[in-house]
A protein has these predicted regions:
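ATP-dependent carboxylate activation and anion-phosphoryl transfer catalytic cores
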Residues: 104-188
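Phosphate-binding site of ATP-dependent enzymes
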Residues: 6-115, 141-143
Length: 188
């Protein structure tokens, strides 16, 4: 991807291009070379009262954490970057990232990633459902890429739907629970 630069000359050239193309400052971040994950969170403190599947939700905080999905973009059309071009590919198609759900992670890392996603959801006051994208830094520490407060819901394609399917949650049940949670917020 052109957005990844390897030296100061490339950085200066790319920043100049961004500033000239978009007529605004450029954001420069350190590239995180570690594994990439996405973690879905659904619910709220009273989720069990509105859900058709109260057993999905944690007794302590009312949230459901979906299985962790790992994205491996090393063989995608944009190696090592989960770009729009890579996302546009269908699961399993040549040039698409590889998806592993549930991801094979150590129990301690699983706990960290799920807590990280939960905290991001809470801190942003997200409603009902969100999906947090996380990458590990060179020391293996989780770092926030972004939080999606309106995650995609395309069946057999969108990350949250792949996570739900990995634990046996039917697509219709996922959608209905999101709708029931939203309706409950409005007293419906």
């Amino acid at each position: 991807a052109k957005a990844i630069v390897k030296n100061e000359a490339e950085l200066r050239e790319r920043v100049k291009w961004v500033v000239n193309s978009y007529q605004q400052p450029a954001l420069v971040e350190t590239f995180l070379s570690g594994r990439e994950f996405t973690v879905g969170v659904m619910g709220r403190a009273d989720a069990k009262l509105y859900s058709r599947h109260p057993e999905w939700y944690d007794d302590k905080d009312g949230f459901h954490r979906f299985p962790i999905l790992e994205l491996d973009a090393s063989r995608s059309v944009t190696p090592h970057v989960y770009s729009q071009a890579a996302k546009a590919k269908n699961v399993g198609e040549k040039g698409a990232p590889d998806y592993f759900c549930p991801a094979e992670v150590e129990p301690e890392l699983e706990k960290k990633l799920k807590h990280f996603a939960y905290r991001a959801h809470i801190l942003l006051n997200a409603l009902d459902v969100s999906r947090t994208d996380i990458r590990l830094d060179d020391e293996g520490n989780p770092r926030l890429i972004e939080i999606n407060t309106l995650p995609g819901l395309t069946p057999d394609y969108s990350d949250l739907c792949l996570q739900a399917a990995a634990e046996g949650i039917a697509y219709n049940d996922l959608l209905l629970d999101i709708l029931y949670l939203a309706a409950g917020r409005w007293g419906l």
